[in-house]
């Protein structure tokens, strides 16, 4: 039977519930347990697919094509379990389902209420998402006390009661601030946060106390006394210089032992040698490179969370410190390519909309003409094709129909038809809704032997995740290929361009898929590893 660990946060948001939860999950997995994780988001959007990156940050795409919260990226980077659409749901998704059932008459004329109908649906989804895992970590988004979170908190209160104390526990993250003028940490915010939880019938079993200063034994003892939490279950989690230290920090305080004993689980001790190796490689690099990341959402770097982590993973696998120089593509439009001088490689990630696109195209031209290693992802591939068409073929009006519907040379256009992972044909038009209508999830990609991308993967067929609605225009592809642009990857049915490479260039690869979604700290990712190797070669050439 599955055991549940419900995770809540108090005092302030952004305490790192996702990282802490994933770190505990990683330790339990290292003990031989099957672990899965769920994220419950209290906003009314059905999913984050149409939300602004400036508000929500990254949209993480699962293997089965769900557009989800970025915390699911943390989950997959810390544990081996592959997340699905069942691992993340929102208030909007729950209400949508309940209202659809009401319209069908499934409730037989009953008055639909938050309790029991909404809470029952939340519980049903939690149980379904947990599947047959030994332990399911269930993270509740937001902060205790928020109105939006109340249905979720009531649902976990009910579920905790229904399955019993031997199968459910509550882990609460809280802030223990350090007051510089007093020279001490303060426990009162934590006491009040737990008081708020207890007022709705939830008593924490574990407190994870976040702080930027050490929390001494006396403070932990005081917290335990005033919150009715065992002293051994009051965990001090100070800021760390890398998030991959967190599993070791939690393990050193016996959190996994407490969980295993509480649930009565029989399992091995934790083998954290893989995490120790990751931390060692991260903190003791032998080389260093600087890579320019040219994007349009630089005001909120969480918009590129998986990509930034993937570059870190590539550094780990190459024993190389990767310094990312974050450059807003609009700054290139205004200030020119001087911003790119001195870098060892250039990375252009995905994005939507016209703003900043010309700056990205200029960055591609700089990389291609100056033989600087280049990796383009999603829009980064599309702008690479546009740049090549403009400056090599001489099609000065070349563009994507996303940015200029009247372009004389629309080298990138809307995908109107494609096969999904099951072989079913999906169609789209300009009139289709924005939400949930992209080419999403894992798709086969056929690689050309002898290409740079094939050298990276060492395979003829790969599977990578997608999130896009525009593609290279096959009608103009013959001229583009004749001019020298190499098509080194195609979709499984051969219909869509997946990877392009520039001719006469040491390392220029652009892909339509999002490889960052499958990169992990322990295994890295072959494409990012190859990119960092190319940057290192470039750096050594300049030395």
Swiss-Prot record:
Positions annotated to bind Mg(2+): 71, 139
Residues passing through the membrane, by range: none
Pathway(s) of this molecule: Pyrimidine metabolism; CTP biosynthesis via de novo pathway; CTP from UDP: step 2/2
Binding site for CTP: 13, 146-148, 186-191, 222
Active site: 378, 514, 516
Protein's recorded name: CTP synthase
Start and end residues of each Glutamine amidotransferase type-1 domain: 290-541
Role according to the record: Catalyzes the ATP-dependent amination of UTP to CTP with either L-glutamine or ammonia as the source of nitrogen. Regulates intracellular CTP levels through interactions with the four ribonucleotide triphosphates.
Additional detail: CTPSs have evolved a hybrid strategy for distinguishing between UTP and CTP. The overlapping regions of the product feedback inhibitory and substrate sites recognize a common feature in both compounds, the triphosphate moiety. To differentiate isosteric substrate and product pyrimidine rings, an additional pocket far from the expected kinase/ligase catalytic site, specifically recognizes the cytosine and ribose portions of the product inhibitor.
Region annotated Amidoligase domain, chain positions: 1-265
Highest taxon of the lineage: Bacteria
Gene Ontology BP annotations: 'de novo' CTP biosynthetic process; pyrimidine nucleobase biosynthetic process
Assembly notes: Homotetramer.
